[in-house]
């Protein structure tokens, strides 16, 4: 499935109510609405709760994650196994989640019936590293817990895909797995020799395969330096990286990236910085465009086809905007949208003998 969006909606929004979030979504992301978190409206509105709250085997308290091993939970996990293998719509409803913006989001989908939409969930590698009563390297090497992470994320994804398809059957749901701790995989591997790269690739592949079977697409988002070969080898449709702070993160695997793009994959360049008010204040569209072109050209010089580098590109802000003053949060998001409209379209398709 070929993704078509040029501006990827990213991060928490700064609003304290649904009305303002709805207004921005319809104005800037009518072709790809997203299920935003609004922590300024509800401090429990976050990806951790969205992904894990109410799931058997996990206990959440003040943003802490505890894994529970009781027999009662293991019985529930057996039920999850059955649902994962045969995703019955009624059974999926047992694992629904709620967010502050969810009802309004589904109303938007029903009303405008967009081509694509985005829902973010926490990815399994990050979930494992947030658990307090188990070592991450040990828990990821344990087949039982990997299965728990895979099924938790997948079942949550399948439920929201079903809800989207209910109101707009032709909309493509893109499930983006947020993996801020993907860059720590090397450290985890050194801590436990049983934890191999193939284990992590296989974990992502199982989630990706099941979501695609349910007519969704899958992306991985990480704004730290990491090994992007892992999600690419797992068969994801999108990788989203910090192109502002780590612009060369994918240049070192240019051949891998080129094959990914040729196969229909897409790269999101999170190149609009939102770290500080001062940084946003000095931004202009000309500065951003110049930086974007130079960053993409560096990838082309590394060996990636210019045709695919530009034609399979989208842009976004670099993270959450809920801590910024409203005027600067909106400025960053608007600039990302403006930049997306300036992404060059390369018309000359590369020949088999040239990567240009």
Task: Annotate each PLM feature.
Residues 237-349:
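Catalytic-face loop-and-helix region of soluble metabolic enzyme cores
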Residues 1-142, 233, 265, 299-302, ...:
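Alpha/beta catalytic barrel-like cores
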Residues 118-121, 174-179, 221, 312-318:
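Extended hydrophobic secondary-structure segments that form protein cores and membrane-embedded regions
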Residues 13, 39-41, 122-124, 180, ...:
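An acidic- and aromatic-residue-enriched active-site/binding cleft used to recognize and process polar
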